Amino acid sequence: MTKIAVLGGGSWGTALANVAAENNNDVRLWTRTATQADEINSQHTNQKYLPDAKLSSELMATSNMALAVMDAEIVLTVVPTKVVREVARQLADVLNKQDHQVILAHATKGLEQVTYKRVSEMLAEEVPAKYRSTLAMISGPSHAEDVIKHDLTSVSIASENEEAAKLLQQVFANSSFRPYTNHDLLGSELAAALKNIIAIGSGALIGLGYGANAQAALLTRGLSEMRALGQAMGAQPETFLGLAGIGDLIVTGMSPNSRNYRAGKQLGEGKSLQEIQDDMGMVIEGVSTTKAVYEFSQHHHVEMPITAGIYRILYENEPLRDVISDLMSRPLRSED
C-alpha cells in the first residue's frame, strides 16, 4: 500500500485519486472547501465535477493540505495552470516541515502566462530543492468522465527519473487503466498544453457545420505545429506520436467530454467566449494556453498558422470564417 496525496478536487484530480484508491492505496484528496471534502467522505460523490459518479469508499478527502500530505510517498497536483504556483507555495510550506523524500507529480495541461513555463518548471521553482529530482507528469487520452466509469484508458507517465515513473505506473495500473512510462517530460508537457489549442479549432469547425475531412485536416496539421514547436524547444519528436501527443490530441479534439472542444464548438455556433466561460463554470485551459503559445511562437519565430488563427479568434474577435479562409488560401507548399 502506497500513501498518496492528490491535490485538487476537480474532475481529473478526483478520477485519478479514485483509481489509486481502488488499487488499495492509502489516498487522501485535498479539496478547496470542507463542504466538498465532506460530500466525498460521507456520500462518496463529487457532484459538481463528476455528476452521478460513485467514488470508492476508501477515498478520503480533506480541506487541510498538511493532513493530506502527511507521510505521503507520492504527491500529485491536479489543479488549473493559473493556480499551480499558489498551490505549490502552500505545498512547499508543508514539505518544509517534514524530512522524508516524496515523488512529486502533476497532471495539469497548460503553460504559464507571460513566462511560458511548463508546470514542472513552476513546481521546481516553488518547492524545496530535494523534491525536484522526481518530477513527473501523467498525461494522455484520459477524460475523467470515462476513467471514473472504468472505460479502458491508457496514459503516459513522463519523468527523467525512471524509478519515480515506474512507481507511479505501479500504483495506478489496473485492468482498465494502463500507464506507460517515457522519459521526455519536456515533450509530454508541451504536447499536453498545445493540443488544447488545436481542440478549440476542431470544435469550431464542427460548430460551423464542417465535416470529418476538415476536422481530420486540422488535427493533422495541428499535430505538425505541436511537433515543430516541441522540436524548437528541445523535445523529442516521437513523443508527439505517442499517448501524450496524438493520443491526447485525438480524444481532446473530437470528444464532447473535452471542454476545449466544446468551447470551440460553441464559438462556431455563435456564442461569445465570455458566454461560454460563464456557462461552463470550469477552466478552459486552451484559452490561456493559446495566448502564451502564440506570443512564444512570435518571439522565437516558429511558424504556427493554426495557433495564430485561433489566437485571432479568441483575442482579436476575428470572425471564424475569415480565419479559415486565410488558412485555406496560404501559399501552397509541401507537407514536410
Curated annotation (Swiss-Prot):
Gene3D superfamilies: N-(1-d-carboxylethyl)-l-norvaline Dehydrogenase, domain 2, NAD(P)-binding Rossmann-like Domain. Catalyzes the reduction of the glycolytic intermediate dihydroxyacetone phosphate (DHAP) to sn-glycerol 3-phosphate (G3P), the key precursor for phospholipid synthesis. The active site is at K195 (proton acceptor). SUPFAM superfamilies: 6-phosphogluconate dehydrogenase C-terminal domain-like, NAD(P)-binding Rossmann-fold domains. InterPro entries: 6-PGluconate_DH-like_C_sf (IPR008927), 6PGD_dom2 (IPR013328), G3P_DH_NAD-dep (IPR006168), G3P_DH_NAD-dep_C (IPR006109), G3P_DH_NAD-dep_N (IPR011128), NAD(P)-bd_dom_sf (IPR036291). PROSITE patterns: NAD_G3PDH. Belongs to the NAD-dependent glycerol-3-phosphate dehydrogenase family. One of its GO terms (molecular function) is NAD binding. Pfam families: NAD_Gly3P_dh_C, NAD_Gly3P_dh_N. Transmembrane segments: none annotated. GO terms for cellular component: cytosol. NADPH binds at S11, W12, R32, K109, A144, R259, V283, E285. This is Glycerol-3-phosphate dehydrogenase [NAD(P)+]. Its EC number is 1.1.1.94. It is found in: Cytoplasm. GO terms for biological process: carbohydrate metabolic process; glycerol-3-phosphate biosynthetic process; glycerol-3-phosphate catabolic process; glycerophospholipid metabolic process; phospholipid biosynthetic process. Pathway: Membrane lipid metabolism; glycerophospholipid metabolism. Keywords: Cytoplasm, Lipid biosynthesis, Lipid metabolism, NAD, NADP, Nucleotide-binding, Oxidoreductase, Phospholipid biosynthesis, Phospholipid metabolism. It catalyses: sn-glycerol 3-phosphate + NAD(+) = dihydroxyacetone phosphate + NADH + H(+); sn-glycerol 3-phosphate + NADP(+) = dihydroxyacetone phosphate + NADPH + H(+). Sn-glycerol 3-phosphate binds at K109, G140, S142, K195, D248, S258, R259, N260. Coiled coil: none annotated.
